């Protein structure tokens, strides 16, 4: 029983629910695997414990520094507010100097206000466990250019941000992310298809 949810699956069944197959077709199919673990992370206590367990695992592997990224808006299914989610995750950091949080805005068609709230929370908790923002999700369905406007607010707040770009979409997505002010690019594998883009990123 985890977070009020009974898990009767075998280890192999759990792996099937959490891992994509070798013939995974695209990013959207990959992202579907987030749905199950998210059901277990809808209470503050579960979020705090998850962060602590993740950090303990990293420490045991000798990882010196990490930035744990997650989307607060995806943890509201049982009544938590985004701020309660962020506070729970910060609590799990236990004031660590070596493990921090990146708050993700999500690509979508009806969540602009949620994304704006994420940006405001990143501003509020910047330097208090939060170090940056991100934009994640289904890049092909919701192109990077659709989010230029809301990230102007992040720039106004001087919040550093990274953007997942150039994974499911082409190099133009990376170019847009750079134009938006991204300091880092998540994945960005399509850059390898363009010598000009490689030079621009160098």
Whereabouts are the PLM-identified features?
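Active-site metal-binding loops of divalent metal-dependent hydrolases
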Residues: 165
């Amino acid at each position: 029983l985890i977070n009020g949810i009974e898990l009767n699956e075998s280890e192999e069944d759990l792996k099937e629910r959490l891992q994509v197959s070798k013939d995974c077709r695209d990013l959207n199919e990959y992202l579907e695997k987030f749905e199950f673990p998210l059901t277990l992370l809808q209470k503050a206590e579960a979020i705090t414990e998850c962060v602590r367990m993740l950090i303990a695992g990293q420490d045991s592997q000798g990882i010196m520094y990490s930035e744990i990224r997650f989307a607060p808006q995806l943890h509201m299914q049982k009544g938590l507010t985004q701020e309660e989610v962020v506070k729970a995750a910060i609590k799990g950091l236990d004031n660590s100097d070596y493990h921090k949080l990146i708050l993700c805005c999500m690509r979508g068609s009806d969540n602009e206000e949620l994304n704006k709230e994420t940006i405001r929370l990143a501003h509020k908790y910047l330097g208090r466990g939060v170090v940056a923002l991100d934009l994640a999700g289904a890049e092909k369905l919701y192109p990077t250019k659709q989010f230029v406007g809301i990230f102007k607010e992040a720039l106004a707040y001087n919040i550093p941000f990274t953007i997942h770009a150039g994974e499911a979409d082409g190099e133009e997505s990376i170019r847009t992310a750079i134009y938006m002010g991204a300091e880092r690019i998540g994945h960005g594998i399509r850059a390898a298809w363009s010598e000009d883009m490689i030079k621009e990123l160098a």
